[in-house]
Amino acid sequence: MANEPPTSTSAPLLSIIIAAYNDWAALTSCLRSFAQQTNPPSFEVILVDDGSAQPPPDFIRDWNNQYPLTIVRQPHAGVSAARNRGAQISKGPILVFADADSRFHVNCLEALAATIANFPQHNSFQLRLTGDCATLVGRVEELRLITLQDHLLQPDGCLRYLNTAGFAIRRTQVDVEAGVFYTGAVRGEDTLLLAGLIERGQLPFLVGNAIVQHETPFSLLESLRKEIRSAYLEMDTYKIIDSKGVKYRVTYRERLGMLRAMWKTSGRASIGRMAWFVLVTRQVLRLVLHFVYRASGAR
């Protein structure tokens, strides 16, 4: 069943697609951020409920009074399948993928639309992601995102990084009916999509003034558990990417450079050294898991 948006005589420029699974409270702030946009282009929001225990509550559906919001429910099939479903029912020429815990800054959609119009040679766009420095876990996320987006930025403005907390792509560049994302990827689906773009020589262009804050509503222990679980679930996806022969991993020299840059950035009062130690611990855990996985023969 769908909660249909108000009738429109023309397709919106942006179709914002969000997969949700039992996270209605976090989603509220995300949907509110769309209502607070200044001078936005025409847009619609497609919310795919991926088999949540309870249907979307009224306080979610009521955002349909602020902008076109379509809500569809499906049996639990994973985030990739949910995003594919959203893309298939969307109308806009630009597909924008976001997470339920993404918060779009007030001029984000305006900046994204301007960049898309000014750079027709680019087909995909990575929005600039930030963390919430109000908590330690948020400061760790801020440090991680600053480091990745600074060090993986190419001279032409493209980025060797893709994160679907805020990512856009032209509809003409994907097979919407076949699926934008590979549904066999439980985690790491955005990295698999990046590998496909690398194969085509089309890295996403970084839209530096289109800012999305990626919330991390976890305790420190919960974030470490999530990191371990994600690293484990991503391994099969990375095996698929490796089979393609696509070079996407950073080199050991790059890792050392990023480690030094992280230490320098953590000197900012808004981030702090503790964020550096936590982030390094997380990355060491991830590397150990990957080493064990490879040493075991990836069975």
Q: Residues of each region from the PLM?
A:
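Conserved donor NDP-sugar-binding/catalytic core segment of glycosyltransferases
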Residues: 107-139
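A conserved hydrophobic helix/loop-capping motif in glycosyltransferases and polysaccharide synthases
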Residues: 14-26, 30, 37, 48
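Short, flexible, basic/aromatic active-site loop/helix in glycosyltransferases
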Residues: 127, 141-160
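Acidic donor-binding loop at a coil-to-helix junction in glycosyltransferase catalytic cores
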Residues: 186-195
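Non-catalytic, C-terminal membrane-associated alpha-helical segments of glycosyltransferases
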Residues: 226-233, 244-299
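Acidic donor-binding segment of Leloir-type glycosyltransferases
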Residues: 31-73
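Short aromatic/hydrophobic "clamp" motif used to bind/position activated sugar donors
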Residues: 95
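Glycine-rich, basic loop-to-helix element that forms the pyrophosphate-binding segment
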Residues: 74-90
